[in-house]
Curated annotation (Swiss-Prot):
NCBIfam families tied to this protein: mutS1, PRK05399.1
InterPro entries named among the record's database cross-references: DNA_mismatch_repair_MutS, DNA_mismatch_repair_MutS-lik_N, DNA_mismatch_repair_MutS/MSH, DNA_mismatch_repair_MutS_C, DNA_mismatch_repair_MutS_clamp, DNA_mismatch_repair_MutS_core, DNA_mismatch_repair_MutS_N, DNA_mismatch_repair_MutS_sf
Name of the protein: DNA mismatch repair protein MutS
Alphabetical UniProt keywords: ATP-binding, DNA damage, DNA repair, DNA-binding, Nucleotide-binding
The organism of origin for this protein: Streptococcus pyogenes serotype M12 (strain MGAS2096)
Length: 851
């Protein structure tokens, strides 16, 4: 678009826009933020606002769109949610006093990863992630700008990087190196991330001091540089950098967490129906965030787990005190977010009042915790800093009825500042003085309807109608003439008016200065406030887990070093909550020291997947320190959980169900140790029957012989149950059924041994398929069951056909032709017992080429 004959104001816009080409520029002009040129056209479509033009009569009018400054945040939120950046340019001087073009500067760049203010506040974290690469390992740092949380780690490969980004649910990733086109596609198209780039490392190392690798230091430094560059201010609320290792937590991929519905239901993408939903009896926003973090990252340290358990047990044993604690926590606001608003210079009077109300609750919370009289709880008590001096400052300084905005006045309490009280007295008494003057002049002049009015142009004046002009005293002076009246002033009235105007102006200015001073004082307490926030969040999560344990009759799990799993009458905690205790059928799970694999058979809808998820959730709950849904639980400490439960194509990256299965299986067998838990449901169903069966067997054997992880493998391939005769650490279990008078009842109970039938047609019957179709399926099943297992049935004609007709519909693999001989030789050369699953898959594909 041609940009000729540009006015000075528009030239200023273009100069600023040049520095922010990848962002929408909101350009403050009076009471509006304006957008121009391409920004205006695009924003009008995205925000559904009017598109107009500047200099409409010009040859090339400039597209323009705008939003009111007081409601701009909701429009910014929309753009950020859509994955865009927004640069906010403010007027840096009073337009009335400006000479020439009003000075404007960008004061903040808001991006999906740096949101602090929002018209729709969310208690969840919003992480900005930075990734760097040194040619060998990846450094990954993340920060929540709204809370100050700041962490860093290093990772071995891009798959781990991708998984960690997904686990953090980041919306923006900052890169300090060039990604391959494939990796960019994964991040942008598959994970819907905004990619930003930063090459400069933040110079001040004070925030990133510590024992870090070079690549970790670089990632953290570039993250800091980007945040300072976009926020354009010192961020006093940023917390000390925390180094963490993935191995210090129970490792789970994003796919595993999703399949287990840990923080949201995978089908609805809502919190309801997730483990997070079940366990959330928190009372604070900080507690909600910490609970989610505990679910995301269960512990592997037995000592740390037992410490949490002990406090939960203490809370469970003291119902009255715990109830008082929960009620007190309801009065605690989001200290972390309030601290960040103070740091950003955006805290308003309501924010400080919320901080004050929170601090007023802290002594009560501390006293309740002391009343538990427990050494483990005393550690929390000792970490609680009540900050009484800050609470006193806010309570005595800020009026409890103060408005949300600073400009409205009435912020500071009466009695806090003598000068402010004086000005307020002048304004308050000035109204009485004016009433006295009005009464006096009415009596002395004899003008019965004489009154004093006010407007911005003339100030205070006497209103005299034309019929009374002859009675106007000599000391009155004319201020304005109207059609039917005159406006007059007096020296006395002018003096009072001057005093009142001075008091109003001085009061407004002084009150603003006092508030700024108080906010600056609050900022000096940010580090102590953040430590208090962490302690209160921990207390909140622990009381939440105690409430959930009591409500749902959970028990305290035990841990062993013998690699034994014992779960008596265990329940899937979330399913039980949804169904109700009376409806749910519990199942025991047992792995002795020798057993590493349970091969579970049984029909769909019978409860195999629920059984596997039950074990995973029990492990996760136990290792996050929670009590669990069972009569008795004794577990080893797991280092990782790998799952493949439920079929799902990866449509965005174009990967089929089978490919996704193989990739997840690959991750499991490569990364799992003998301290891991593997849960595979119907692995191999995404390909031809024999391909799938061969791969399933090869994977089972590989896990058995080389990995040694505790594994539950659910399958419809009943032939695999024979593996128990040669794999000493594999046992068969099945879902029990009851057959009576041709009807089948799924008992949803796990029993020893293999299933004798799959009951697929019965499941179809439950699903309501037509009777004629079910009858035909019975015929086909009967015929198939009479055939040799080595023969793949391509089609089975209805009713009874000759055996020759059947053979005509079969594919012969072992005929006398030359190609069949070649295939037979290839098959005989395969060493099945020593093949990896992926060697098996490759071999099968090569065999297919020979057909």
């Amino acid at each position: 678009m041609t940009k000729t004959n540009i006015s000075p104001g528009m030239q200023q816009y273009l100069d600023i826009k040049k520095d922010y080409p990848d962002a929408f520029l909101l350009f403050r002009m009076g009471d509006f933020y304006e957008l121009f040129y391409e920004d205006a056209v695009k924003a009008a479509q995205l925000l559904e606002i009017g598109l107009t033009s500047r200099n409409k009569n010009a040859e090339n009018p400039i597209p323009m769109a705008g939003v009111p400054h007081h409601s701009a945040q909701q429009y910014i939120d929309v753009l950020i949610e859509l994955g865009y950046k927004v640069a906010v340019a403010e007027q840096m001087e009073d337009p009335k006093q400006a000479v020439g073009v009003v000075k404007r500067e960008v004061v903040q760049v808001i991006t999906p990863g740096t949101v602090v203010d929002s018209a729709k506040p969310d208690s969840a974290n919003n992480f900005l992630v930075a990734v760097d690469f040194d040619g060998c390992r990846y450094g990954l740092a993340y920060m929540d700008v709204s809370t100050g949380e700041f962490c860093v780690t290093d990772l071995a490969d891009f798959t781990s990087v991708r998984s960690e980004i997904q686990n953090l649910k980041a919306k923006e990733v900052l890169l300090g190196f060039d990604l391959s086109e494939e990796e960019q596609t994964i991040l942008v198209k598959q994970m819907n991330l905004l990619l930003s780039y930063e090459e400069t490392v933040y110079e001040d190392k004070s925030l990133i001091d510590g024992q870090l690798t070079t690549v970790e230091l670089t990632a953290a430094g570039k993250l800091l540089q980007y945040v300072h560059k976009t926020q354009m201010r010192e961020l006093s609320h940023l917390q000390a950098l925390v180094h963490y290792e993935i191995k210090d937590y129970l490792q789970m991929s994003y796919a595993t967490k999703s399949s287990l519905d840990l923080v949201e239901n995978a089908r609805t993408n809502k919190k309801h129906g997730s483990l997070y939903w079940l366990l959330d009896e928190t009372k604070t926003a900080m507690g909600m965030r910490l609970l989610r973090s505990w679910i995301d990252r269960p512990l592997v340290s037995k000592e740390a787990i037992l410490e949490r358990q002990e406090i939960i047990q203490v809370f469970l044993n003291a119902f009255i005190e715990r109830t008082d604690l929960s009620n007190s926590l309801k009065g605690v606001y989001d200290i972390e977010r309030l601290s960040s608003r103070v740091s950003f210079g955006k805290a308003n009077p309501k924010d400080l009042l919320q901080l004050g109300y929170t601090l007023a609750q802290v002594p009560y919370i501390k006293a309740i915790l002391e009343s538990f009289d427990s050494p483990c709880v005393d550690k929390l008590v000792n970490d609680i800093d009540s900050l009484p001096e800050l609470e006193y400052l806010i309570r005595t300084a800020i009026d409890p009825d103060a408005p949300a905005t600073i400009s409205e006045g009435s912020i500071i309490r009466t009695g806090f500042d003598e000068r402010l009280d004086h000005y307020r007295k002048v304004m308050r008494e000035g109204t009485g003085w004016i009433a006295d003057i009005e009464a006096k002049e009415r009596q002395e002049s004899g003008i019965n309807n004489l009154k004093i009015d006010y407007n911005k142009k003339d100030g205070y004046y006497f209103h005299v109608t034309n019929s009374n002009l002859s009675l106007v005293p000599e000391h009155f002076f004319r201020k304005a003439t109207l059609k039917n009246s005159e406006r007059y002033g007096t020296a006395e009235l002018a003096k009072i008016e001057g005093q009142m105007l001075e008091a109003r102006e001085e009061s407004s200015s002084l009150e603003y200065d006092i508030f700024m001073c108080i906010r600056a004082q609050v900022e000096t307490y940010i580090n102590r406030l953040q430590k208090l926030a962490k302690t209160l969040a921990t207390v909140d999560v622990l009381q939440s887990l105690a409430v959930v344990a009591e409500t749902n009759h959970y028990i305290r799990p035990q841990f062993n070093d013998n690699h034994v799993i014992t779960i008596q009458e265990g329940r899937h905690a979330v399913v039980e909550k949804v169904m109700g205790v009376q409806e749910y059928i519990p199942n025991s799970i047992s792995f002795d020291q020798q057993t590493s694999i349970q091969l579970i058979t049984g029909p769909n809808m019978s409860g195999k997947s629920t059984y596997m998820r039950q074990l995973a959730l029990t492990v996760i709950m136990a290792q996050m320190g929670s009590f669990v849904a069972a009569d008795h639980v004794d577990l080893p400490l797991f280092d990782a959980i790998f799952t493949r439960i439920g079929a799902a194509d990866d449509l965005i990256s174009g990967q089929s169900t089978f490919m996704v299965e193989m990739m997840e299986a690959n991750q499991a067998i490569k990364r799992a140790s003998d301290n891991s838990l593997i849960l595979f449901d119907e692995l191999g169903r995404g390909t031809a029957t024999y391909d799938g069966m061969a791969l399933a067997q090869a994977i089972i054997e590989y896990i058995h012989d080389r990995v040694g992880a505790k594994t539950i493998f659910a399958t419809h391939y009943h032939e695999l149950t024979d593996l128990s005769t040669k794999l000493t650490s594999l046992v068969n279990v099945h879902v029990a059924t009851l057959e009576k008078d041709g009807d089948v009842t799924f008992l949803h109970k796990i029993a020893e041994g293999p299933a004798d039938k799959s009951y697929g047609i019965h499941v179809a019957k439950i699903a309501g398929l037509p009777k004629s179709l079910l009858k035909r399926a019975d015929e086909v099943l009967t015929r198939l069951e009479t055939q040799s297992r080595s023969t793949e049935i391509m089609s089975v004609p209805p009713q009874v056909e000759s055996s020759s007709a059947v053979r005509q519909g079969q594919l012969s693999l072992f005929g006398d032709d030359e190609k069949a001989h070649e295939i037979r030789q290839a098959l005989e050369a395969i060493d099945v017992m020593n093949m990896t699953p992926f060697q098996a898959m490759t071999t099968l594909y090569e065999l297919k080429k020979l057909l």
